A protein has these predicted regions:
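Surface-exposed extracytoplasmic segments
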Residues: 1-203
C-alpha cells in the first residue's frame, strides 16, 4: 500500500516500485487450518521476507467475500467487499522474543452494536477495525482489540532463536518454495479461533 493508506481506509491505494525505508520486502504468505482434538478450530499463518530489519509488523485480513485484485497498482474499493465480522490479525515482532498477535473485527454498527468508540484506531469512526466490549474483554485489557498472545489464544515465533549450547544457526528451509531462509526472515503463528470467540464451541 502507498499514498498514506491506513488499515481502516475503504479505498486503499496499491503501488509498486521500491520498498520504503524500514518496511519489510515480503515474498510469501501461508495460511492453513484444521480442527484440533479438542474440537476447536485452529488457524495457522506464516510470512517470509527478503530483508532483515529486526522488527516486523504484518497484517492478515480475512474476509467473507471475494476481494479486489491486490497484485496490480491502483485504488481498490475494499469498503464494498468488507463485511461485519471480517478479521484482521496483526503480527507484531519487536526484533527479539516472541511476537505479539492481536485480533480486530470489521465493525459497522449495523448488526454488531458497535459505536465509533469501539474502533481500535485513535479517533476512528465506523466502519472500522476494532472490538465491541464483549470481545475486548476476552483478554482483560481495555484497548479495543483482542490480545491473542496475552489471552493465551495464540502462539507465534520468528526464526531468531539459539539452541541450548548458545550456537545460533537460525537458517531454516522452506520445503514448499524450496528456499533457505536466513535469521529473522520467517514468522509463523497458530491461533485458536474457538477460544478467541471467532467460532462458537461446536461450530
Amino acid at each position: 500500500f502507498g499514498q498514506g493508506t491506513k488499515e481502516d481506509d475503504l479505498t486503499p491505494t496499491v503501488v509498486n516500485g521500491s520498498i520504503p525505508p524500514n518496511k519489510s520486502d515480503l515474498t510469501r504468505f501461508y495460511i492453513a487450518n484444521n480442527d484440533g482434538s479438542n474440537g476447536h478450530k485452529f488457524l495457522y499463518l506464516a510470512w517470509e521476507r527478503t530483508n532483515t530489519l529486526g522488527s516486523a509488523n504484518m497484517d492478515f485480513e480475512i474476509n467473507k467475500l471475494a476481494q479486489p485484485d491486490m497484485t496490480t497498482p491502483g485504488t481498490k474499493n475494499v469498503g464494498a467487499t468488507r463485511s461485519p465480522g471480517d478479521l484482521l490479525i496483526r503480527y507484531d515482532f519487536g526484533g527479539s522474543g516472541a511476537p505479539v498477535l492481536s485480533l480486530v473485527k470489521w465493525l459497522t454498527g449495523a448488526t454488531d452494536g458497535a459505536v465509533s468508540g469501539d474502533c481500535n484506531a485513535s479517533g476512528g469512526t465506523l466502519p472500522c477495525w476494532g472490538a465491541v466490549p464483549a470481545d475486548d474483554s476476552k483478554d482483560g485489557i481495555n484497548d479495543n482489540q483482542i490480545d491473542l498472545s496475552a489471552a493465551g489464544f495464540a502462539d507465534g515465533a520468528v526464526n531468531v532463536l539459539c539452541n541450548g549450547a548458545n550456537k545460533c544457526n537460525d537458517t531454516i528451509h522452506d520445503p514448499i518454495a524450496n528456499v533457505d531462509l536466513p535469521s529473522a526472515t520467517f514468522g509463523e503463528a497458530a491461533i485458536d479461533l474457538t477460544a478467541a470467540g471467532v467460532f462458537p464451541a461446536g461450530q
